[in-house]
Amino acid sequence: TVRADEVPLATVPGMPPVADPANLYRETGANQFSPAVAHALERVYVPNRAANTVSVIDPATLKVVDTFKVGVNPQHVVPSWDLRTLWVANNAEGRSDGSLTPIDPVTGKPGKTIAVEDPYNMYWSPDGRYAIVVAEAYKRLDFRDVNTMELKFSIQTPACAGINHADFSIDGRFALFTCEFNGAITKVDLVNRVVLGTIKLSPYFNRPDALALIATPGKKPRMIPDPGQPGNEICTTPGMPQDVRASPDGKTFFVADMMV
């Protein structure tokens, strides 16, 4: 008899196999580093958005050992799919000179910056074929060559204002992206390259009459009468999701919402 947790999980072509369908994080424990990072320096890379720099910290001494210039408004430092490069996402907020700066983790030094439109954040397709650049200002996901960052195709996400952070389904077929500025989550089909839907993070997600009364971000929330349920009130606080993570078995996603 074969136990359910011993049956291989069907994933998208090219994606590494899931070692344990009951715990997708099983291979991320202590002393389970990939051979690809064997020669990488043990460092912490911190983007300094206002200074347009990255500071490098030695965790053994807790001292800054280097600081170097990158592009305008660095937001995140993201390891590549093969773990051999770190990419700094410089989105140049409100400008047109966004870029990506590679860092060699073996030397801790930056390489040549590549011009890329509005890279607020970065992910990778589960098969490692594409870099997924989160173009927040344009409500768009740009799929690019993992080395040259040449644009290959885009997926528009018009209902996802402030698209930023994401996590993937355990089989690699879809991803959920948070929509920070309109309190929502967007589901993207990575196989067919389409948006499957967007849902508001609100107790009133299935009530358009109530959602229409929710305050826009930046507005002071208040309690107002519920138009659909006399005697009840609605808090107009909008959601502001920051991140999303899958449960170990991949059956549930947890959203970190700083407002609701």
What are these regions (language model features)?
Residues 1-260:
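Predominantly soluble domains enriched in secretory-pathway, periplasmic, or organellar proteins
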